[in-house]
């Protein structure tokens, strides 16, 4: 697949990694640090979201806990929910978005029926075929020799390319 994020990710393809200027980096270094001083962005750490509050099906507030104190923050334009493959569906469900048959039984007021919320967690299967080859220069031959490692290192240092730019799971 050319892009694992298109929704049709059957097949195989190159892994996407976060990099900046040829260096692997965390999401915070690649995306958050460059914008964290914006006046329209507030980053709150050590918080646990209780729920999102809606007004006419538009997200307006987020209730969150820090230690034992409940806070509410409101947004003028948008709220971005980015709490992972388990946290995001859980927050949506406690906020009233999901399968009504499940949420009503828990006493959660329905905001929007969306049956797929919390129902589509998939394992990320990775299959590594192993082949024995002859008379072909392979990456394994390079990385299993001191000279090969030196060449790999130099290619990365001078060109920001080669095996050292690949994700660990490639």
Regions found by a protein language model. Give the residues of each.
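Conserved redox-cofactor binding core of oxidoreductases
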Residues: 1-59, 65, 128-153
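Active-site rim elements
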Residues: 18-22, 90, 155-162
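Short, well-ordered helical secondary-structure segments
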Residues: 19, 30-31, 108, 118, ...
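Glycine-rich loop(s) and the adjacent beta-strand/alpha-helix scaffold that form part
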Residues: 52-55, 59-153
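Short, intrinsically disordered, charge-balanced linker/junction segments flanking boundaries
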Residues: 161-170
